[in-house]
């Protein structure tokens, strides 16, 4: 696969992963009510996210409430907010860096510098995926630990929500896309012909006898 194809495929994966990360950040489904034992039949289900909590009635009616106070939130929610938003903003910056270093753009002159810019974009997407993976795994670990904690009442136990799975898929796409971008940039650095240089050859001059030198025909 050529370097241009790697860049395009990597950028598409990163854009899809970026969209998934934004979706996971905004969805109020990081943890959902766990139905255990006598709690199987219930009139409502509770969803909790980074920005709001929602209560879904058995009739299908849903009521959401945005968190009023930041200081009243738990440590993991505050950290997840900061890290997830940072990852989303970093992906936005990485998009412009990647486009500047792409072979199909003229923001940077073709050559090793352009390949290094593209490589920087790939590294930023990799770091973005890792940055988003930290709050997802941290939050999931807390939910699982409280789920198996016998001291936590059954009514307060939660399960992993859909937003966590969407976030994990998004981070996977970001990291795979970042790897492809890095590979495409690495191919460019090892192949000077991809910078499309213009080369001129000096005209051959005949010898004193009027004939061209024999070495020109070897």
UniProtKB/Swiss-Prot annotation:
Lineage, top-rank taxon, reads: Eukaryota
What coarse category fits the chief subcellular location reported for this protein?
A: other
Q: Which GO terms describe its biological process?
A: bicellular tight junction assembly; calcium-independent cell-cell adhesion via plasma membrane cell-adhesion molecules; cell adhesion; cell-cell junction assembly; establishment of blood-retinal barrier; face morphogenesis; learning; maintenance of blood-brain barrier
- Region annotation (Interactions with TJP1, TJP2 and TJP3) maps to 217-218
- One GO MF term: identical protein binding
Pfam (any one): PMP22_Claudin
**A cellular component term (GO) from this record?**
cell junction
Q: Which residues lie on this side of the membrane: Extracellular?
A: 29-81, 144-159
Q: Give compartment(s).
A: Cell junction, Tight junction; Cell membrane
Positions in the Cytoplasmic compartment:
1-7, 103-122, 181-218
Query: PROSITE patterns given for it?
Result: CLAUDIN
Name the keywords, alphabetized: Cell junction, Cell membrane, Membrane, Tight junction, Transmembrane, Transmembrane helix
Subunit notes for this chain? Directly interacts with TJP1/ZO-1, TJP2/ZO-2 and TJP3/ZO-3. Interacts with MPDZ.
What's the stated role of this polypeptide? Plays a major role in tight junction-specific obliteration of the intercellular space.
Protein's UniProt name: Claudin-5
